[in-house]
Amino acid sequence: MAIEKSVASASIAEVIDRILDKGVVIDAFVRVSLVGIELIAIEVRAVVASIETWLKYAEAVGLTVDPATT
């Protein structure tokens, strides 16, 4: 995959279109402690993609179920 450098700015619609086309994975872990006592821990894993992108990925890694076998 080649990386292209562009000096033109992108509109929000173009950014959203690219995110939905390629997909984005957000993986975050936050821990709040006070004097060594964990008060709160938050773990987030989120995927943002279009349904078409997800279906292509799911088919490629074998996550889809054949309707004829169910």
Curated annotation (Swiss-Prot):
GO cellular component, one term: gas vesicle shell
One Pfam short name: Gas_vesicle
InterPro entries for this protein: Gas-vesicle_GvpA-like, Gas_vesicle_GvpA, GvpA, GvpA-like_CS
The keyword DNA damage belongs to this UniProt entry's keyword annotation: no
One MF annotation (Gene Ontology) recorded for this entry: structural molecule activity
Record-linked HAMAP family: Gas_vesicle_A
Family: Belongs to the gas vesicle GvpA family.
UniProt protein name: Gas vesicle protein A
The species this protein was found in: Cereibacter sphaeroides (strain ATCC 17023 / DSM 158 / JCM 6121 / CCUG 31486 / LMG 2827 / NBRC 12203 / NCIMB 8253 / ATH 2.4.1.) (Rhodobacter sphaeroides)
